[in-house]
UniProtKB/Swiss-Prot annotation:
The record marks D217 as: Important for receptor turnover. It is found in: Cell membrane. The modification Phosphotyrosine is found at Y235. Induction: By lipopolysaccharide, interferon beta and IFNG. One of its GO terms (biological process) is natural killer cell degranulation. SUPFAM superfamilies: Immunoglobulin. It is a single-pass type I membrane protein. The lineage of its organism: Eukaryota, Metazoa, Chordata, Craniata, Vertebrata. GO terms for molecular function: IgE binding; IgE receptor activity; IgG binding; IgG receptor activity; immune receptor activity. SMART domains: IG, IGc2. Detected on myeloid cells, peripheral blood monocytes, splenic and bone marrow dendritic cells, and thioglycollate-elicited macrophages and neutrophils but absent from lymphoid populations with no expression observed on T cells, B cells, NK cells or other granulocytes (at protein level). Expressed in peripheral blood leukocytes, spleen, liver, thymus and small intestine. Expressed in splenic dendritic cell subsets (at protein level). Residues 22-102, 119-188 form the Ig-like C2-type domain. The chain crosses the membrane at residues 204-224. This is Low affinity immunoglobulin gamma Fc region receptor III-A.
Amino acid sequence: MWQLLLPTALVLTAFSGIQAGLQKAVVNLDPKWVRVLEEDSVTLRCQGTFSPEDNSIKWFHNESLIPHQDANYVIQSARVKDSGMYRCQTALSTISDPVQLEVHMGWLLLQTTKWLFQEGDPIHLRCHSWQNRPVRKVTYLQNGKGKKYFHENSELLIPKATHNDSGSYFCRGLIGHNNKSSASFRISLGDPGSPSMFPPWHQITFCLLIGLLFAIDTVLYFSVRRGLQSPVADYEEPKIQWSKEPQDK
């Protein structure tokens, strides 16, 4: 059994080493906002290492492969169904961490560049209108209280976030003569040393390989055990008959 397990373990170890040595691909959004309105245009860019023989890219939406192999994946007119997690992978890069994109319906949307901020991070907020219609007299509100007012629409920048900046945000302004408000969005701050939302991909790969090795070990164990027990079960003790020699008569 150990003679069978050793080559398998070597193969899995080699594969794990190759995976650990590869750089992870990265997905970037252009524009940078993770929340958009319907009919907005969004470009997802994949950065990774390519091989001379293969410069194609694999794109995934909610873990399903997208039939697209270019470095840029363009969503010309976003729809709610385009919401979800996006990943990419190149020939010489491991699969990227997921980037979450949300597509909303409405007149106004409070946009942000990240889902989770750390203390000290800059926070960029934007009061975005459907079809980029002009918005005037924009107010950003935190926990129901006015935080910043702009006569002409502008982004709200918090240079270094503190825990006092966490809370529920929304914006409101005039589109034409109509007063419109966005839905609320909660901004949460984590500690700088807090772990990432998603475990590193090489850790996931290692766990999968260990699980696969355990499954192979179990199958081989029972196969060898069955093979050793079968001859014993089929064995029957021979019957011995004694006969007297002629001189014993």
